[in-house]
Amino acid sequence: MKIVIASSHGYKIRETKTFLKQLGSFDIFSLADFPDYYAPKEIGSLPEDNALAKGLHAAKELNSWVIADDTMLMVPALNGLPGKFSATFAGEDACDKDHRKKLLQEMQSLESIVDRSAYFECCVVLASPEGKFFKSRGICEGYISNHEKGSSGFGYDSLFLKYDYKQTFAELSEDVKNQVSHRAKALQKLTPYLQDLLEKHLVSRN
């Protein structure tokens, strides 16, 4: 069964592909396979808004079931920032390293783990070409390190430590991160719907 990951981000694609392959025989594509596709701009204030907009748009345009997601990093001491600005915190054209640098600057005066607490919130949407959709949410709580650690992952991974872990997301192995991350939690909640799709696809083929 064909399914499209509504992302061109290599790490997101790899993480979602790993999850899907564990479930069964999906024919997995991503937006990298559709160079002429134009993705809508992310303007939502919640991960759910962006994931739903991305998923429904891609499913209709590509005539395929689609998995889309959106993630935001929230720091309560910064009134929820970066939040909806997670991907543009240091500016529209800034890179991940610039965003991390700005976050560290904003948190310079915060010393305790309590003050540096943060959480990732991820929404994943499974959408059909006809506009049907299922959505799930995953949250991972932790805190922001006072310096970068690790070289894996992307975004704010090298700054974020999950509670009860001594390593940042950028230091964890992919296997471990794929079990405990916000995206992993959201994807796991979609398992029954994905398995149902596969079963119906196999029945229709027979």
From Swiss-Prot:
SUPFAM superfamilies to which the protein is assigned, alphabetical: ITPase-like
Catalytic machinery residues: D70
GO CC annotation: cytosol
Cofactor(s) recorded in Swiss-Prot or TrEMBL: Mg(2+)
CDD domains xref list: HAM1
GO biological process, one term: nucleotide metabolic process
The UniProt record lists the keyword Metal-binding: yes
UniProt-annotated binding residues for Mg(2+): D70
Record's cofactor remark: Binds 1 Mg(2+) ion per subunit.
UniProt-listed Enzyme Commission number(s): 3.6.1.66
Subunit (UniProt): Homodimer.
Stated role: Pyrophosphatase that catalyzes the hydrolysis of nucleoside triphosphates to their monophosphate derivatives, with a high preference for the non-canonical purine nucleotides XTP (xanthosine triphosphate), dITP (deoxyinosine triphosphate) and ITP. Seems to function as a house-cleaning enzyme that removes non-canonical purine nucleotides from the nucleotide pool, thus preventing their incorporation into DNA/RNA and avoiding chromosomal lesions.
Homology family: Belongs to the HAM1 NTPase family.
UniProt cross-references to PANTHER family, sorted A to Z: INOSINE TRIPHOSPHATE PYROPHOSPHATASE (PTHR11067:SF9), INOSINE TRIPHOSPHATE PYROPHOSPHATASE/HAM1 PROTEIN (PTHR11067)
Protein name per Swiss-Prot or TrEMBL: dITP/XTP pyrophosphatase
